[in-house]
């Protein structure tokens, strides 16, 4: 999840050759409509807080809907780039991976994921593509099977499988606390990276992937993310401050890596955002890029340190 185009956030991606240019709009220095981003972010935050406090199991339904929307966003972008992606088994399999965690936990998530991948591999064998690959004449497309399936499996891991780990966070007795701990860490990391990166960012981290991510912004992410996690881990999940500090480092790293992965994917596809669902943010996947790997990390820690 990232609101940033500086520090540890997403860059204003440079479109690949032939990609459509997006019209310029009034934005902040980071390249976003800051006012819209704040309003949307606060609205989503208030809804999630209410759910986690009063009806925590509804979190699973929210994750399931997010899985559906984010998967569709990425599939659409991949198809625009010429990949032949089996969307129906991805959408259905993603729901299976999330909902099977309710009765079966991690076993259900892995079963849903494994079944989804197998069905996608078979489904792709019989897909027709007379639009982006017209030479097939409407017959099953024999070319690019490996690249299409590789992109499909990557997407299945990136969104449905990672989302299923996010759903499992809420099941333990203190599950809401763990979700809050992870979410607050990601938000604090983003905000700290944005502020410090915009004000002081001079040394790019990975200029070939994301030119506006700076080491100064990453330092801001570390300070804010670790501080927030120490507080939330101590008071919400009953961990010692040193465990909170380690969790903070872990969450900041997973958030930054998630941002970089999505930045690389968008650079490969020649796009700036995955979608337009959330004003000031882009698509839903542009909000989830840092959250998803952090959810996996949080579940692993929760499992190893109950």
Swiss-Prot record:
A Pfam match: CTP_transf_1
Chief subcellular location: membrane
Compartment list: Cell membrane
Pathway membership, UniProt: Phospholipid metabolism; CDP-diacylglycerol biosynthesis; CDP-diacylglycerol from sn-glycerol 3-phosphate: step 3/3
Listed InterPro entries: PC_trans (IPR000374)
Alphabetical keyword list: Cell membrane, Lipid biosynthesis, Lipid metabolism, Membrane, Nucleotidyltransferase, Phospholipid biosynthesis, Phospholipid metabolism, Transferase, Transmembrane, Transmembrane helix
Keyword Metal-binding in annotation: no
Gene Ontology BP terms: CDP-diacylglycerol biosynthetic process
Statement: the UniProt record of this protein carries the keyword Transmembrane: yes
Entry's EC annotation: 2.7.7.41
Region annotation (Disordered) ranges: 1-28
Chain segments annotated as transmembrane: 36-56, 82-102, 103-123, 151-171, 180-200, 218-238, 241-261, 285-305
Molecular function GO labels: phosphatidate cytidylyltransferase activity
Family note: Belongs to the CDS family.
Protein name per the record: Phosphatidate cytidylyltransferase
Annotated source species: Mycobacterium bovis (strain ATCC BAA-935 / AF2122/97)
